[in-house]
Swiss-Prot record:
The modification Pyrrolidone carboxylic acid is found at residue 25. The gene is ANG. Its EC number is 3.1.27.-. TRNA binds at residues 45-46, 105, 127. The keyword Metal-binding does not apply. It comes from Pongo pygmaeus (Bornean orangutan). This is Angiogenin.
Amino acid sequence: MVMGLGVLLLVFMLGLGLTPPTLAQDNSRYTDFLAQHYDPKPQGRDDRYCESIMRRRGLTSPCKGINTFIHGSKRSIKAICENKNGNPHRENLRISKSSFQVTTCKLHGGSPWPPCHYRATADFRNIVVACENGLPVHLDQSIFRRL
């Protein structure tokens, strides 16, 4: 009986180590995506907006070179990962069927250390994301296209 419990405990412990990532881990990547790229109701979309939001989101130590904020509903952004608002795009990416209001903040000046100065570009664009388990987890800056 003791040997049977030991084997059962061993199998249980091994099973814990071999299980796939939990939904909570998946949601943390989505949460990180939102923290870095989502701002539903921006207060202005100029250089001051960029400097303020980049600082508030912790993207200024060191100064991040470029970051894009998406202004739209979470539902429409998540829908890119489905056929509702997204199509396959290149390897493991999806492109939105509709355009989104975005603000891209680009570092202006030579130093990567604060104080960081940003230039804002406000636009409407289709966006390209990487998805995991039906949630956006990465915004692909390099293949944006203007409409």
